[in-house]
Each structure stands twice: as C-alpha cells, then as structure tokens.
Amino acid sequence: MSAHREETVRRLAAPDIAARKGGVPIVCLTAYTAPVAAALDDACDVLLVGDSVGMVVHGLPNTVGVTMEMMILHGQAVMRGSKKAMVVVDMPFGSYEASHEEAYANAVRIMKETGAQAVKVESGPTVPETIAYLTRRGVPVMGHVGLRPQAVLLEGGFKAKGKDDAGRAKVLEEARLTAEAGAFAIVVEGVAESLAREVTESVSVPTIGIGASAGCDGQVLVVDDMLGLFDWTPKFVRRYADLKGEIERAAAQYASDVRDRSFPGPAETYYAKKP
C-alpha cells in the first residue's frame, strides 16, 4: 500500500447549506469556467453556474437566449475546477415551465451530465408545484424570488420588486410557497432591505441576497461584476478588483513588447544545443 494517500475533500451539499440558516453568512459567487471555479473554491460555500453566463460570457442582451447545452457545458467546467464548494446550476428559461415531467427530465439531465449538487429555478405562479415535484423525486432545488431576470421581456426590464404593499405581499408569498415546496435555500434579488429581512425571518430556509441588503442569510454576486470586468457597476455591487483595467494594461504592454521586438526575449526563447 502506498505510504501517501490523496486527501479527500468533501463537497458541500444541500443539507450543509440548509443548516446555515441564521448562522455564519453563506458565501456564493457565480462561476462559469474551470480556472475561475478553482480560484473561488476555497472562499465560497456555493458556486452558482448562473444563466447570467449568457450575458457576461456570451454577450447576450439578457438570459432568455440561454440554452440547456450552454448551462451543461459551463456546469461541467465549474465542477472540474472546484472540489469543496457546492455547485448549483440554473435551469434556463423554457426548461422547466411547460410541465413537471419536462422540468424533471431537464433537471436530471443537468445533474447527471454536470455532476452538480442542485439546480435553481426562478419563481412564478406554477413554480412551487414544480419545486415540490422535483424535490419529491430527489432533485435538490434552490429557489429565486424578487427580481426575475428570465422575466425581463415580460416585465419590461430589470426592475426592483416589492416597492408597494401588493408587491411586498407577492414576494413574501412566493418565498413562503418556495420554502414549503422543499427548496433548500432561496435567492432574493432586487428588493428593499426591510423586505429582504422580512422574507428571511418568514421562511425556515436560508436566503441568499443579491441587491437585497445584509439582512439575508448569505450573499451572491456575479463574479465578473465583483472583479471589475465591466465599465458599469450595478448599485448593489462592491468591486473588489479592476480586472478590466489590468487586462487592458497587460494587453497594451504585450502589444508594445511585440512591436518593438523585446518579446520574446532570451528568457522566452529556445536555443539549439551547441555540438
């Protein structure tokens, strides 16, 4: 027997995240590629393969055009790059709304082909029933209430939710139904602090906020926003780096070195051995 054993790292799963209700805040970031997933893995509890990949990686105007194939491809990459964090894959628009059976088939396909630990679905009138159908059949589901990016065409843009009494009641009801249906956690997006706290206090599962204040049980951001890869930064984002600026500076220096023939230099050049 070998004297050296490879250390096994246990990946977090739905019960671990569910148990964090009211405890140390859950750390979540989006990830779409293996190298970024590897870099985020130690710091994060959850890596969300969000359908935001359509906008931040593929340049789409919204998430409506994201496909199952795209989500599976990026889910596979994130699973390969990470070891510890729970990986949750968004179910794209049109993959879970038509029927419970279709939602189940697509959720199972995502989990089998990626190896992810759960899927995420956005709220809607029939979605709690779908969540219940999936969880009864062994599929861990993360919910999503408040601002729904997949409904951007229906609602005329990315608009904060719960601004009046009726809106607040709707978000609270969606959260209640989502939790009761069996979701192990709920993303709360684009709502006022008071509503985020009320949602968090009203459900028995952890809430993970994005644009929803520190009143949630955890936080998620799009990693490209957090790293400063875009010129525009949403109000709810704190930029922890300026990678766009770093990339531009590195590319400019590389271009200069190529044009003045200082790259490649002796250190980057292969030479034939002298006889």
From Swiss-Prot:
What reaction does this enzyme carry out catalytically? 3-methyl-2-oxobutanoate + (6R)-5,10-methylene-5,6,7,8-tetrahydrofolate + H2O = 2-dehydropantoate + (6S)-5,6,7,8-tetrahydrofolate
* Primary location class: cytoplasm
The places in or outside the cell where this protein is found are: Cytoplasm
Does the record's keyword annotation contain Metal-binding? yes
- Which amino acid positions bind 3-methyl-2-oxobutanoate, per UniProt? 51-52, 90, 120
The answer on whether this UniProt entry bears the keyword Transferase reads yes
Where do the coiled-coil regions begin and end? none
Pfam families assigned:
Pantoate_transf (PF02548)
Q: Which SUPFAM superfamilies match?
A: Phosphoenolpyruvate/pyruvate domain
GO BP terms in the entry: pantothenate biosynthetic process
A single MF term (Gene Ontology): 3-methyl-2-oxobutanoate hydroxymethyltransferase activity
An example GO CC term for this entry is: cytoplasm
Quote the CDD domains the UniProt record gives.
Answer: KPHMT-like
Say what the protein does: Catalyzes the reversible reaction in which hydroxymethyl group from 5,10-methylenetetrahydrofolate is transferred onto alpha-ketoisovalerate to form ketopantoate.
Q: Which family does it belong to?
A: Belongs to the PanB family.
Spell out the protein name for this chain: 3-methyl-2-oxobutanoate hydroxymethyltransferase
Q: Which lineage do the record's taxonomy fields give for this organism?
A: Bacteria, Pseudomonadati, Pseudomonadota, Alphaproteobacteria, Caulobacterales
Q: Which gene encodes it?
A: panB
